[in-house]
Regions:
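Membrane-interface coil-to-helix junctions
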Residues: 16-111, 134-153, 257-284
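Specific aromatic-rich, kink-prone transmembrane helix
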Residues: 153-168
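Transmembrane-helix signature of polytopic, membrane-embedded enzymes
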Residues: 114-137
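Transmembrane helices and adjacent periplasmic/lumenal helix-loop junctions
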Residues: 140, 147, 180-208, 230-238
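Short hydrophobic alpha-helices at membrane interfaces in multi-pass membrane enzymes
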Residues: 168-183, 217-220
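Perimembrane helix-loop-helix junctions
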Residues: 165-167, 196-229, 307-311
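Membrane-lumen/periplasm interface segments of specific transmembrane helices
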Residues: 189, 225-255, 263, 269-277, ...
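Start-transfer (signal-anchor) and selected internal transmembrane alpha helices
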Residues: 1-22, 221-228, 305-313
């Protein structure tokens, strides 16, 4: 890619993020979402900046729910975003501005990451740009535009990109890079991190089949090295969650079933959708409106048809 292409991809990603969060881009220092989660996210950022100075060894003993311990792990700690915010908070940058920059930045970097992955897989700059916009503008993402952690999904496509590169040319450096991407996704959003690890485990047989026995032999050691890196980077972060689970308990089977996606979840769009809002409560519910968008589906089908046509020809 040329520098002009990279600049164009960056501009498109930022424009998409600004549209999704509109009108916050016009009032970065004074406007945040009216949803209570925006205030909660700003508190999380501020707590981390406070705790790393005042009580770094007790970071997860936040100033809520006293006398309970590990209360910062009662929700997603957004440790990566908080770490990025620390120097800005210390410099006196308004907290609302920091939150908005991280929110919009999470969407934009997600678009750029998907653009990079698809560009690597297809060698098509146009397809990459379309995929980046589609990933950034998912109806699910728009519905949760107030949730800081749910906008930070860039490390999902980056994990797949590093994994493809590892299978293509197995090296320890690429294995470590893959592990780092997984760890960063966990630190940015535990939800996505857990789902990413599960999907990686489920798709491993397909990669082994694709790679073949000889390539698998070469890939296995770097892959295990990457897995070890991911565990080492995330274990100190996940231990407080295990401790918190002993305090508040874990989700029972009924609750897991209630919030698990079904096939009809992928037909449900947010109620704010102009064309598909009627599907919001018919086939979905909160957290389970996963329709990817008609344009995305049609373009995906067109891409499959076009690829098949090229193969046949």
């Amino acid at each position: 890619m040329t520098w002009a292409s990279r600049a164009g991809a960056l501009a498109l990603a930022c424009a998409t993020a600004a549209i999704i969060t509109w009108p916050q881009a016009l009032h970065l220092t004074t406007t945040v979402s009216a949803h209570h989660d925006a205030a909660f996210s700003m508190w999380r950022l501020a707590w981390l900046a406070h705790a790393v100075v005042q009580q770094p060894a007790r970071l997860f003993d936040a100033n809520i729910f006293l006398p309970a311990h590990r209360t910062f792990a009662f929700s997603v700690a957004t440790l990566l975003q908080g770490t990025l915010a620390v120097p800005l908070i210390w410099a006196g940058v308004p907290l609302g501005l920091i939150y908005n920059l991280l929110l919009i930045g999470g969407i934009a970097t997600s678009a750029l990451a998907m653009t990079g992955l698809v560009r690597y897989l297809t060698r098509s700059h146009t397809a990459a740009l379309v995929a980046g916009v589609a990933f950034a503008a998912l109806p699910y993402r728009v519905e949760h535009a107030m949730h800081l952690e749910l906008q930070w999904s860039a490390f999902i496509p980056l994990t797949w990109w590093t994994l493809h590169r590892l299978v293509e040319q197995p090296t320890y450096r690429r294995g470590v890079a893959c592990g780092v991407m997984v760890a960063l996704q966990v630190l940015a959003c535990v939800y996505y991190g857990v789902l990413l690890v599960l999907v990686l485990a489920l798709t491993a047989p397909a990669y082994w089949w694709y790679a073949g026995t000889e390539r698998l032999r070469l890939t296995l050691a770097p892959l295990l090295c990457g897995a070890a890196v991911a565990v080492c980077l995330t274990l100190p972060y996940l231990l407080p969650y295990a401790a918190a689970a002993r305090i508040v308990g874990s989700r029972d089977t009924a609750e897991v079933a209630r919030y698990s996606a079904t096939l009809t979840s992928f037909l449900s769009s947010p109620a704010t959708s102009l064309w598909w809002g009627w599907t919001a409560d018919r086939w979905g519910s909160a957290e389970l409106r996963l329709f990817p968008g008609l344009a995305t589906l049609l373009l995906g089908a067109l891409g499959l048809w076009w690829q098949q046509r090229r193969v046949v020809a």
